[in-house]
Amino acid sequence: MKIVLISGLSGSGKSVALRQMEDSGYFCVDNLPLEMLPALVSYHIERADETELAVSVDVRSGIDIGQAREQIASLRGLGHRVEVLFVEAEEAVLVRRFSETRRGHPLSNQDMTLLESLKKEREWLFPLKEIAYCIDTSKMNAQQLRHAVRQWLKVERTGLLVILEFFGFKYGVPNNADFMFDMRSLPNPYYDPELRPYTGMDKPVWDYLDGQPLVQEMVDDIERFVTHWLPRLEDESRSYVTVAIGCTGGQHRSVYVVEKLARRLKGRYELLIRHRQAQNLSDR
């Protein structure tokens, strides 16, 4: 049976993610105490229900991270496929969202401010984030989060999942990258008026960057680095590795390099391509 545990920071969009799981055909349970998870799985099996499970766990249920990881290992040992989805956002964004909704944080009390509660929650959940697929919703609306969840669900993962993410430095850097590479020193198609409207997926930009020796050298170097270290991460039983590639605007060079790497790594690793800012690529 496939079981998805959804966790993350309060205000980051866990409820939206859980609703998308339900719309995708999962049997969903919100805020389940972890000690009840084995009983839920057993009940599901006894009913001969083939529906996959999605369970939301967070600080409201008094989650014990050590217990959570033990439960995951135990369920996997019984042959279940257990995935962890972690939803987060930048603290400034979360503060704004709480202010707009006027809701209280689950950890807030007279002794802790909202910001202190958010920091404590982030520290508390970090060990769970380490083994999870992470979605940063700082620059997402609900529809975009739903799309990101659907894209993740499409991946049938049996081993290490390599997430190739492109972004623009002028919009900020991703906070969940395991490796980050900077493409801003490479020739920039943006300064060619004919190439500016295109993206790194379009043939005119592709042809231009294909002809740049520095660009090819950079791709070669990143491929060598990544393929050298990924086996080490697999040995540590990592489920996900995020490789972030950035350029100034996240439109030309970083997109091209991610697509080029994906072609080279295809067949060796399970891949998911993800972007942060290029909204015109959201339906790729």
Swiss-Prot record:
Is this entry keyworded Nucleotide-binding? yes
State the source organism's domain of life: Bacteria
Task: Extract the InterPro entries matched here.
Answer: P-loop_NTPase (IPR027417), RapZ-like (IPR005337), RapZ-like_N (IPR053930), RapZ_C (IPR053931)
Molecular function GO terms recorded: ATP binding; GTP binding
Q: Binding residues for GTP, per the UniProt record?
A: D58, V59, R60, S61
- Do you know which HAMAP family this protein is assigned to? RapZ_like
Q: Which NCBIfam families match?
A: PRK05416.1 (NF003828)
**What is this protein identified as?**
Nucleotide-binding protein NMC0691
The species is Neisseria meningitidis serogroup C / serotype 2a (strain ATCC 700532 / DSM 15464 / FAM18)
